[in-house]
C-alpha cells in the first residue's frame, strides 16, 4: 500500500480505499521508505525504536503517578511480555500508538500533577492529535483521557484545557473525510468474528503469555509488595488516580466489546495495547516503599520468568520469525529450488517481485489478489499449469481441493503464525514424503464406508462396468451422511473435505452439495457450494468440492459436544443428476 507515485494516490488508493486505519502510519512509511528503501530491518526500525522508548516512558509515568517502584515494575512487564515485544517487531500502528499515547499521558500528567505549564499542554495536544492519526483505538483512548481531565481540572484552568481539546479536534478535521469514507465501506466484520463471553479472560491470559508461572509471579509480586511495603492504604490520596487507571484500562475494552456485539466486530487484542500499561501501574501502586535489593530481586524474577515462558512455553522465536510471505517464498524458491514450480497465492504482486529479487530466483505465479476470479476460472487456471510442482498459500478449502485434483501428491506442508503453505506434485517424487488425508467416509453406491442415508431406490447398477450410480431423477434430496462432531473434532479444530463426482445427463441445473452443523435440532452453521459454478459440460463426469473449517464454522468455540455435522446433496430444481462417488 506504499507503491504510489504521489501523495494524493497514497491517500486515495492506499488509505481511503485500501485500508481501514487512519492515514498516519501509511504516510510515515511512505516517506520513510522513500528515504531508506525497503530493507526489512530499516522498514521496522521506527517501530523497534518506539517499543524501546515505550519502556522508558511507561517507567516515567509510573514514577510520576506513584513512585519509582511502580514505574520499574510496569516497565519490566512492557519490556518482557509477548504482547509488547510482538508489536515492536511489526510495522503496524500498534507500538507507535503505544508510544504516542504514553507520551500524551506523560505530558497530561505533568500538567495535572505538577506545575500547570503551557508547554505541557501544548505537547499533550500534539501527541493527542498524533494518536488520532495513528489508530482509531488510540484516538478512542485519547478521547477517554481528555474527558477524564474534565473531572480533575480546577476552575482557573478550565479555559486553557477546553481550548486544548478544541485544538485537538481542529487538528483532526483534515482526516474526517477519510474516516467517513472508510466508515461507509464497512469495517473488518466480514472476516472478524464477534467476541465471545470469554474475550476479557482470554485477553488477560494473552497479556500473561498463557502461562501459570507468569500468573504466579504476578500474584506473588503484588502480595509481596503489599506485605513488605511500609504501609498500605486503599483510601489515601492516590485513590482518585487508581480509579482513573481502572477506567483507562477497562473502558476501551467495554466500548470495543459492545460495539463488536451490537454493530460490527472490530475488537482485537492488538487494539488494547494503548491502555494495557495502566493495568500494571494499577496493580503495582498499592505500596509505599521497598528496599532496592528486594526490588532488584523481584524485577529479576519477573524478567526471568517472562523471558523463559516467552522463549520456551510460547516458542515465540520459532513461530514469530516464520512470517507468511517469507515462508511461502522460502518453500517455493529455496526448498523447491530444484523443482519446476508454480506459485498460487493471494499476494499483492509487488510482494512476489520483492521476494524474487531477495532470493534471486523467478517463478511463474498466479495471485488471487484483485483478480476477481470465480471457482470456475480458478479451475481453468489450475488445469493450464505446465509445471510439475505447485506451492500454494492463502487458498480457500475448495481451491486447495481443485489443486490437489490435478496435483494429487501433497509433498510438503508448513504452517505458522497466520499462514499455511502447501506443496503439491503432479507425479509421485522419489524420496518425497507423501502427506495423505484421512478418509472418514466414502460411497460409490456399491461399497461404502460410514453410515450413509439409504438411497437404494435411486441406485442404478451397470452390469457392463460392474459399477453403481445414484441417479436423482426428480428427487430433491440425495445421498447424505451425518457425523458426531465430537468424535471428529473434539477440540473444535479440523478441516473436512467433501468431494462429489457428478454428471448432468440432460442440462446443467442448479444443485448444491451442502454442509450444516446442527445443535438441538437447530442449524447453527450452513454452507453450500453450487455444483453449477464448477463450469460443467453436459454429459461429462466432473468433480465438485466443499470444505468445512470446523474452527471457523464454530467461531472458535472449543467444545463440540452435542453437535452433528451433516453433508448432503440438494437438487433444488429436481432435474436429472447422476452421482458416481462421494
What are these regions (language model features)?
Residues 1-434:
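Terminal, non-globular segments
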Residues 427-461, 582:
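Extracellular carbohydrate-recognition regions
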Residues 443-445, 483-513, 542-552, 582:
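Extra-cytoplasmic beta-strand recognition segments
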Residues 455-477:
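Short carbohydrate-recognition loop motifs
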Residues 471-497, 521-531:
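Secreted extracellular polysaccharide-interacting domains
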Residues 523-558, 574:
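Extracellular carbohydrate recognition and processing domains
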Residues 566-574:
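Short beta-strand-plus-loop segments that form exposed binding edges in beta-rich domains
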Residues 574-582:
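Exposed low-complexity, polar/acidic, P/S/T/G-rich flexible segments that act as propeptides
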Amino acid at each position: 500500500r506504499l507503491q504510489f507515485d504521489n501523495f494524493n494516490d497514497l491517500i486515495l488508493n492506499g488509505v481511503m480505499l485500501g485500508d481501514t486505519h487512519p492515514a498516519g502510519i501509511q504516510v510515515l512509511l511512505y516517506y520513510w521508505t522513500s528515504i531508506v528503501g525497503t530493507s526489512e530491518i530499516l522498514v521496522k526500525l521506527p517501530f523497534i525504536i518506539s517499543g524501546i522508548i515505550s519502556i522508558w516512558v511507561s517507567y516515567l509515568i509510573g514514577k510520576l503517578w506513584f513512585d519509582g517502584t511502580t514505574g520499574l515494575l510496569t516497565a519490566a512487564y512492557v519490556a518482557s511480555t509477548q504482547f509488547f515485544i510482538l508489536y515492536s517487531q511489526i510495522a503496524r500502528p500498534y507500538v507507535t500508538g503505544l508510544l504516542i499515547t504514553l507520551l500524551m499521558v506523560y505530558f497530561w500528567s505533568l500538567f495535572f500533577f505538577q506545575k500547570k505549564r503551557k508547554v505541557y499542554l501544548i505537547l499533550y495536544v500534539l501527541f493527542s492529535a498524533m494518536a488520532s492519526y495513528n489508530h482509531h483505538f488510540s484516538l478512542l483512548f485519547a478521547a477517554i483521557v481528555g474527558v477524564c481531565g474534565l473531572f480533575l481540572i480546577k476552575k482557573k484552568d478550565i479555559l486553557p484545557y477546553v481550548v486544548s481539546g478544541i485544538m485537538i479536534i481542529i487538528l483532526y478535521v483534515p482526516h474526517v473525510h477519510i474516516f467517513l469514507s472508510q466508515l461507509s465501506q464497512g469495517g473488518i466484520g466480514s472476516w472478524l468474528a464477534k467476541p465471545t463471553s470469554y474475550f476479557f479472560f482470554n485477553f488477560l491470559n494473552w497479556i500473561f503469555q498463557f502461562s501459570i508461572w507468569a500468573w504466579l509471579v504476578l500474584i506473588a509480586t503484588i502480595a509481596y509488595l503489599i506485605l513488605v511495603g511500609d504501609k498500605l492504604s486503599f483510601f489515601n490520596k492516590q485513590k482518585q488516580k487508581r480509579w482513573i487507571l481502572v477506567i483507562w484500562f477497562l473502558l476501551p475494552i467495554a466500548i470495543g466489546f459492545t460495539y463488536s456485539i451490537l454493530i460490527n466486530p472490530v475488537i482485537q487484542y492488538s487494539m488494547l495495547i494503548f491502555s494495557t500499561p495502566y493495568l500494571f501501574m494499577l496493580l503495582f501502586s498499592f505500596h509505599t516503599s521497598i528496599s532496592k535489593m528486594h526490588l532488584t530481586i523481584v524485577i529479576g524474577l519477573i524478567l526471568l520468568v517472562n523471558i523463559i515462558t516467552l522463549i520456551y512455553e510460547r516458542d515465540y522465536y520459532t513461530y514469530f520469525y516464520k512470517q507468511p510471505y517469507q515462508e511461502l517464498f522460502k518453500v517455493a524458491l529455496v526448498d523447491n529450488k530444484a523443482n519446476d514450480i508454480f506459485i498460487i497465492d493471494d499476494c499483492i504482486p509487488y510482494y512476489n517481485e520483492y521476494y524474487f529479487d531477495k532470493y534471486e530466483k523467478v517463478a511463474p505465479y498466479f495471485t488471487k489478489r484483485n483478480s476477481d476470479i470465480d471457482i470456475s476460472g480458478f479451475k481453468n487456471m489450475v488445469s493450464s499449469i505446465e509445471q510439475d510442482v505447485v506451492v500454494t498459500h492463502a487458498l480457500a478449502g475448495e481451491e486447495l481441493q481443485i489443486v490437489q485434483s490435478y496435483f494429487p501428491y501433497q509433498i510438503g506442508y508448513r504452517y505458522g503464525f497466520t499462514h499455511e503453505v502447501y506443496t503439491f506434485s503432479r507425479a509421485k517424487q522419489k524420496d518425497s514424503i507423501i502427506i495423505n488425508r484421512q478418509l472418514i467416509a466414502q460411497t460409490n453406491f456399491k461399497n461404502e464406508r460410514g453410515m450413509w442415508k439409504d438411497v437404494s431406490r435411486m441406485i442404478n447398477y451397470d452390469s457392463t462396468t460392474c459399477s453403481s450410480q445414484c441417479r436423482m431423477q426428480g428427487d430433491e434430496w440425495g445421498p447424505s451422511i451425518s457425523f458426531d462432531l465430537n468424535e471428529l473434532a473434539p477440540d473444535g479444530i479440523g478441516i473436512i473435505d467433501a468431494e462429489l463426482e457428478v454428471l448432468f445427463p440432460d442440462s446443467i441445473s442448479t444443485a448444491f452439495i451442502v454442509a450444516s452443523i446442527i445443535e438441538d435440532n437447530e442449524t447453527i452453521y450452513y454452507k453450500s457450494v453450487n455444483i453449477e459454478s464448477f463450469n460443467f459440460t453436459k454429459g461429462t463426469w466432473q468433480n465438485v468440492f466443499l470444505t468445512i473449517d470446523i474452527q471457523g464454522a464454530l467461531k472458535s468455540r472449543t467444545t463440540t459436544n452435542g453437535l452433528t455435522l451433516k453433508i448432503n446433496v440438494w437438487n433444488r430444481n429436481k432435474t436429472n443428476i447422476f452421482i458416481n462417488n462421494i
